[in-house]
């Protein structure tokens, strides 16, 4: 039977990859449009959306892949090993890239244990397990809880050593956790954009993609689907 692809997802994936190339290779780093740079801290630029787009795509892909397997009668238990294996491969690919970056002067103290592929692997793993064991209503609750919990932690829990919640880079709760528990080197020295605490809202982004995938593969007509998105 011919495999039907979700063309909108293919187009969005291509758009995201093209955007990533544009952001990473603007041509002249001395003259770059502001929207092609990451915001210093507060605020949002087009560049800041690229990584969340990839995580959203991961979520949609999880729905498309494992919904079909469930419809084919494949048991959840038989899918778990493959899910863990795929996540491990993505994580190790990220580690390999980090190792190659410091290969000439390798040191574990200079090795970064986080990155984009690492985050994608974790989001994929968690989202796939959530999808196989919950419905869309529980998924919505989980995503909302992750976002709310992250926000409350950042604005209510005092950063150790400061006595009050801090939101500035390098001294907030997320940075403190990364400094306390992450081995090796962090991307920004005192904090990491793919650190431990920020993984939770990233998972919520993946779940949002799952919900979109569920909606797109539903029985509603396309006009209603577009309106619903």
Task: Place the predicted regions along the sequence by residue.
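N-terminal signal-anchor module of multipass membrane proteins
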Residues: 1-71, 75-79
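Membrane-interface interhelical loops and short amphipathic "cap" helices
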Residues: 26-45, 76, 100-114, 164-174, ...
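Hydrophobic cores of alpha-helical transmembrane segments in multi-pass inner/ER membrane proteins
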Residues: 51-62, 120-132, 201-213
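Transmembrane alpha-helical segments and their boundary/interface "anchor" motifs
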Residues: 48-53, 68-98, 102, 108-109, ...
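A conserved active-site cap/scaffold subdomain adjacent to cofactor or substrate pockets
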Residues: 193-229
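Long hydrophobic alpha-helical segments that form multi-pass transmembrane helix bundles
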Residues: 136-208
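Hydrophobic alpha-helical transmembrane segments of multi-pass membrane proteins
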Residues: 43-53, 113-117, 193-203
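Transmembrane helix-loop junctions in multipass membrane proteins, especially transporters and channels
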Residues: 28, 68-73, 102-106, 136, ...
